[in-house]
Regions:
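Rossmann-like dinucleotide/phosphate-binding beta-alpha-beta segment
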Residues: 17-109
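Hydrophobic residues in well-ordered beta-strands that form the structural core
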Residues: 55, 74, 87, 115, ...
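A residue-identity detector for tryptophan
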Residues: 14-16, 154
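Rossmann-like dinucleotide-binding domain for NAD(H)/NADP(H)
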Residues: 101, 110, 116-215
Length: 215
């Protein structure tokens, strides 16, 4: 909407309806996939806009989700009922192509998918079909399935997603601010220092390695 209004205004069209239709966020349903610290932070901020919050995360207890003012649901319910679907999942065998052809066919035609997690959690071909056949309305991607930075050379034409007007793509930079860069570096340095001192790091993803070291 903002892009359409801006483009029209720059071309000499002064009309408040150039960005229409616009629908308010309040009262809409936001579904969040994966409810770790980032997912919880998203929920906390989204609540201020008056959205209904649903969460799918089989590794988080229902009571923990409910304490955050969210409704725990299964995958199908989340996909069917979400107006905004936030993908914040890590990349695992279980989450690979979490959204693919079957899932997009279940979604609302006005749904918007936003992926600020890992690119391969969404099937690129299925997403393209969903966007071009009006199965969903739009998508925001901070990381497509194949990240261009992982290729020695790339051309936007290699991925048809980049050609669509109803897709917003950022270069894996949705987290970025000068402050966040500083905090990320400080956090990494702090965890390395803990390991050197023989302490347990704060966020181990493979704690079994720590157990072997202790033995």
């Amino acid at each position: 909407t903002l892009f359409r209004s801006d483009k029209a205004t720059r071309s000499g069209v002064w009309n408040w309806q150039t960005g229409a239709p616009v629908f308010r966020i309040r009262g809409r349903v936001m579904g969040i996939v994966s409810f770790g610290k980032i997912g919880q932070a998203i929920a906390e901020r989204a609540r201020g806009f008056g959205v209904e919050l649903m969460v799918y995360d089989p590794y988080i207890s229902q009571s923990s989700i409910e304490k955050m003012g969210c409704r725990p649901v299964n995958k199908e319910t989340l996909i069917r009922e979400s107006d905004f679907l936030m993908m914040q999942a890590p990349m695992t065998e279980e989450t690979h192509h979490f959204l693919s052809f079957d899932e997009f066919k279940l979604m609302k035609s006005n749904a918007i998918v936003i992926n600020t997690g890992r690119g391969p959690t969404i099937d690129n071909k299925a997403l393209y079909q969903a966007l071009t056949q009006q199965e969903i309305a739009a998508a925001g991607l901070d990381d497509p399935e194949e990240e261009p930075a992982k290729r020695s050379s790339w051309d936007p034409k290699d991925n048809p997603i980049f050609s669509l007007p109803n897709v917003l793509v950022t270069p894996h930079a949705a987290y970025y601010s000068e402050e966040s860069i500083r905090i990320a570096r400080e956090t990494a340095a702090t965890q390395v220092a803990k390991m050197i001192r023989g302490e347990v790091p704060d966020y181990p993803v493979n704690p079994e390695v720590l157990n072997r070291q202790q033995n």
